[in-house]
Amino acid sequence: MTIMAQVLHMDSSFPGKINPPVPPSLHAKDQEAPYSVETPYGYRLDLDFLKYVNDIEKGNTIKKVPVQRRPRYGSLPRGYGYTGSWWTSTESLCSNASMDSRHSSYSYCAPGFHTSQRPNFSTARVEKTLMDARRKLEEEKDGRRFSNLGSMHSSMAGSNTSLSSAHSFNRAQGGGSYTPMSSGLSTPVSPTPAHLQHVREQMAVALRKIRELEEQVKTIPVLQVKISVLQEEKRQLSVQLKSQKFLGHTLGFNRSRPRGELYIDIPEEEAGNGAGAANKATGSLSPTTPGSLQDSGCEIEETVIVAGARPGAKREVRTVGVGPEAEERGYRQVGVGVREQDLGLLPETEALKTKVGLLEVQLRKTMQELQSAQQQVEAAQKERQTVCPQVDHAVRATSLGWQDQQGQAGAGLHTVVSFTKQPHQQRTVGIQVYTLEQPTVVGVGTLLRAQGCTHPAQLEASHRRYGESPAAGDSPHEFPIAISSKQVREVLRSEVSKSVPVTNQATPMETKCNQVTAVCQRLKEGEINQQPAEEAIQVDPANPASPQSNLRSIMKRKADGEPGSPYTKKNLQFLGVNGGYESTSSEESSSESSEDESDASEYHEATEKLPESATPQSLVSSCIPQLASETPATQTAQHSTAQIPTNHTPAAQTTSQSHTTDATTQQHVTQSPAAEADVQHCVSQSSVTTTPPPEGDVQCVFQGCNPPSTATSLEQNSVQLSSATQQSKATDSNVQPDLAQTDVSDFAAQQTTTQTQFTSAKPQQEASQSKTADLTAQKGATHSTDGSAKQDIAISSTTKPAADTATPPTNKQTDSLELSGGLMSALHILQKALSEPNAFSHQDARTAYTSVLQEWLRVSCHKAADTAVVKAHMDAFASISPQLLEFVINMADGNGNTALHYTVSHSNFPVVKLLLDTGLCNADKQNKAGYTAIMLTALAAFSSDSDLQTVLQLLRTGDVNAKASQAGQTALMLAVSHGRGDMVKALLACGAQVNLRDDDGSTALMCACEHGHVDIVRQLLSVPGCDATLTDNDGSTALSIALEASQNDIAVLLYAHLNFAKPPSPVSPKSPILGSSPPSSSELK
């Protein structure tokens, strides 16, 4: 009975279908069934037939079972009766005529349900009850059509359960299909319990299959709605793809895609929430769904309600929904594809990478072309410099060293001159030169050492014109000689010096310069007398050789040529005696080759800083060029001496270029014998003319002159070197640091074009001035009637001396300048706060501090600050207390800059001097960037010598070796990086250390190499203790940095400094090694 009581009767039409009204007579018949039960969907079913079947089964004869109840919808058990689900089918089971005849409006007969058994009902009551039940079911069906429509959205019992069952009921109603008459009604037989059990089992199987089919059919409306929604979305997407081709199209996808997902997820998300959730889903469909789809939404609502009770149905809905979800993802991917294509990020990146690669390739090609072009230019320059003289004889030079002469008090210089018949190469190992001259003259300089720093000597030799045929000579030693002078740079990489052949129309002979009696003693005492008929060496007694002297110079020059013969070519050869290097330069008859030669010998610089307490001393080195004739008359020649102390500074580089034109003119003057005699300053035996060289750098001493019939006189240039020194710091306000750096090689190279010939005997004075304000100045040489010359050197800035007027004049009226009352009040408050601990925690102290700081910076820190105003304020501060003065002048702004920082940065050195004169200024205070005022001087510009003195005072006040907090750089590194050669000299003079490293491990020398400052590299290398082998954090040395930066000149300097500091193997055991120091004055005693 419980099973049959669950049989439901569904509406036969879809919602919205108008059914005919039920006649009132049908309602009256409902009350005639006393034995009935209320089904879960609000239908009443007569129980007479059920009662009868139950009585037959149990053997009971109960006639009436009054069941009068209307079950509450909420209390109805889910799956009451069987398998946890209501039977929602309206189909009738007719698998067997003997079953308990549950009736519906549609008969579904599966082939497997038919059996061969016949019904055995024989009782008229059973037949009557069956017919009555069928009739009442039909009436109840018609009567509930309108009630179903009214209670569809308000009652669970009044809602339809399945679209498929209602549809099948409608068909069954139209066909009028009832239980066939062959069910056994004509032959009633009492059923057995086994038969009834069999019927129940068949019914259960049939119901199970029907439920499965219903579950599948229920998804049809949902799928229809989804298909409609997806079609609409497809249409919208197609329209959007056609109309929107750029970034705007993504908005359309974002609007339509979530709506489609809502439709798809209705059965999953809303099933367990009851009718309210289903109503929400229906409401979301209604705005975009046509009227027919709204009706379908009602079906969806009911389907959700039923499916909520069946997990299987819920799972099936998800499975079916996979298809539309995949399709939706397809649209989503299309949107992504369009977005990437429209943006075009990846292609643009690839295009940029391709362009970068092409540019890098082009850059490499361009760099290669540039390097090849530079190599070609260098090769062309070398070819222009290379003019190999075609002569048949050459000069051979070897070193015999310092040897003790028998009967002599000291060491002498042994020189042997010889000729060979065929051209031979020249190999110069030491300082002695074999040359073919009838009388050989050798200039010997002072052989002294100072502070262990040696300097190169210079040897200048020229040959007679080509074409003269010399006679054969006998020389016990002959070496091949390379007569080319083009390989200037290669000279530094080897120990072989290239020489130029010297030809002379003379008889072969070998002359040994033996008469050098007491040379060393006379050098020490400052006097060297000339020896007749031999080489004459003399030092002016008025200026004896100073112990601070540090250079020995040997320089020879031979200007040959018969009177009237055209001047062909001159070659200069320089041999470094002490510095361990050699350089060769040649000069053609044109100014172009002269300039090339001037650049070719700039390879090494040896400088020595003198102690500050030392007074300027002149270094004496006299060279006596003399070409003695074969006649006795010419062997006795008069002599005269002249001495000009020099200071070789970078100024020589400027002046040497200015004299290039003069040198060119001088070469043309030598075309005539008279002009040649004038240029060479040939002097008669009775009179001597001494000509001061330009800038007072070179002094020539002439030891007689040959008659014009035999040969022209040979002029010799003597290099005079002296280092400028500082005077006492405490006694002299014009203290000048030892900034004069001697550069012998540069000097020798520059003098080849400017000082080998002289066109006038007029005194000249040059004061070189450079843009970088080099701290050098030279005073003109004064010459006396007896031929002696003296020159005083002072270190000063290269700007005009008149620039001293740049200092603002002191205004006398400012002595009465009075400060405002507010400032004075703030000063007193500040003074009081200084004597109290934690006084600046009070507001009035902080206010006073701010006021004083603003006023002090306003007065002192701008570019046009007046020294008078600043001094008046400082006097006011000091009148209150020296402590307050010290506190105020060291005040710093928000960036950590003090007044000293600002004044140095603005190059307002008069105010800087005022601050430093107080003795209270903190020169080592760093700003927030980590720089001190001393470091800022690397950018300051000097306008006068007084500014220089102020800078020196600042350098002495603070720590010149302090490092910046950011990169660890020192003031010397900053000055080097900015190319401030004057500041480099000043810093070195004040004790700056050259080997300090920054945070990257770089030294000042590496900075100079990287930025290509050749002069500064020379200055740094000249400092004793400068280590060129240091490496930075990357393992790079100064030489490797110069090579990477294509600084070839610097690389040559470094190579020479590194390699020629090591002495080569000696030629003989007694001879000094090339590159080593000569005997000092103490050793010669």
UniProtKB/Swiss-Prot annotation:
Residues 196-216, 356-383 form a coiled coil. SUPFAM superfamilies: Ankyrin repeat. InterPro entries: Ankyrin_rpt, Ankyrin_rpt-contain_sf, KANK1-4, KN_motif. Keywords: ANK repeat, Apoptosis, Coiled coil, Cytoplasm, Methylation, Mitochondrion, Phosphoprotein, Repeat, Transcription, Transcription regulation. Disruption phenotype: Morpholino knockdown of the protein results in an edematous phenotype and proteinuria. Podocyte foot process effacement and disorganization, rarefaction of slit membranes, and disorganization of the glomerular basement membrane in glomeruli which are characteritic of nephrosis are observed. Residues 136-145, 601-611 have a biased composition (Basic and acidic residues). Residues 148-171, 179-189, 281-295, 614-648, 706-736, 760-788 have a biased composition (Polar residues). Residues 589-600 have a biased composition (Acidic residues). Residues 649-668, 798-810, 1070-1085 have a biased composition (Low complexity). ANK repeats lie at residues 895-925, 929-962, 967-996, 1000-1030, 1034-1063. Its main location: cytoplasm. This is KN motif and ankyrin repeat domain-containing protein 2. It comes from Danio rerio. The lineage of its organism: Eukaryota, Metazoa, Chordata, Craniata, Vertebrata.
